[in-house]
Amino acid sequence: MIKQIAIFLENKEGQASACCKVLKDAGVNLYALSIADTKEFGILRILTDNNAVALDTLKKANFLASEVELVGLEVPDEAGALSDLLIVLGDNDINVEYMYSFAGTDGHAKIAFKTGDLQKAISVLEKAGAKII
C-alpha cells in the first residue's frame, strides 16, 4: 500500500509552483505528481519521501492537504501487463477511481491507484501474481 498526499489548490496561476516550492524548501522529494482540475479548484496528488514532514509543512503554509491510501503495483514493462491486471480488477467488481504511474526499475513500471476497497483489490491482485508495493 502507498500513502499519497492530496492537496486542494485554488485553480489559478502559481498555486502548484507555490506548493512545490514549500515542499522543496522543507527538503521533501517528490517521487510522483498528478494534477486533476475542475473550474474552481485542482487536486495535486503527490508521493513523497517523507509524508510527515510534507503534511506538516503544507498545513503550516495554509494548504489543505490529507493523506490517502492507494494500492501500489510493480508492473512488467511489456505490452498488455497493465491491461491484464485491470481485467482482474474488473472481473472482481473493483472500480479504479484514479490511477497514475511513476518511475520504476529493472524493466518494471510502478502504478498507484485509488479504489473503494483497498484490501479486496490487494487480495485479488496478489492471487493473480501481481507484485504489490
What is the predicted role of each segment?
Residues M1-I133:
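A conserved regulatory-domain signal marking ACT and ACT-like small-molecule sensing domains
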